């Protein structure tokens, strides 16, 4: 029954998260907010809403291992699993990637995150530091986007969930379903994951780093698989880099304002360094244009399997 509840929690998070994004995007556009701002803020935060609610729920329930494990584990899974699986399906030519600056931000933010973790917990001031760093990244991205002179109509066509014809009652319904479903799904998932940890005699940290992290990374995996099939390497890399940025700064930043998140010793001695290492592993693909094909897919998945084995 616990596994069924875990699946229910994941499904609720994904579906409710999609409802929230669609509702928030279309409401913002109705209010006259430019598509560029909606894309860089509301969509970015909205697609990370499942991870955010899981982190907040875990922190308030005193299971910080799940909160931290979800974020750190998701960042590891995003590189090794979310890039590894699509690479088996279709070779991605990463030459001329537009993700170089975002990659540098991601690595820099990872170093900042590790430094803050050595304070022993993520509380109010650590959360504010992370959110300030995220604001700088968003500001830089917005400046770059404006320099590209892309019209608002073009942005609207590419904007996830945008539907100018959507009636107001549907917009409000999507918002309501998202706001109800997200905390409900997070509550079910955290409770079920904690129960699984107790049943198997493992720590909530291990469950957060594996089961919860993989589950909350499934939407990114689906998006990246589609990008690989369409030969959109930039979309695949940008999806992973953007998700990792928001996981570190947005999710832990906001969650730590709600409740302190303690950092278990194993994060400081192992998992955070694995996260940084696999992030740096993306450098040849981003800067040198290495082709991400089947051989590299096998290597990435083997590394991920090895990492999971070391946790068990």
Where are these regions (language model features)?
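Hydrophobic alpha-helical segments, chiefly the membrane-spanning helices
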Residues: 1-312
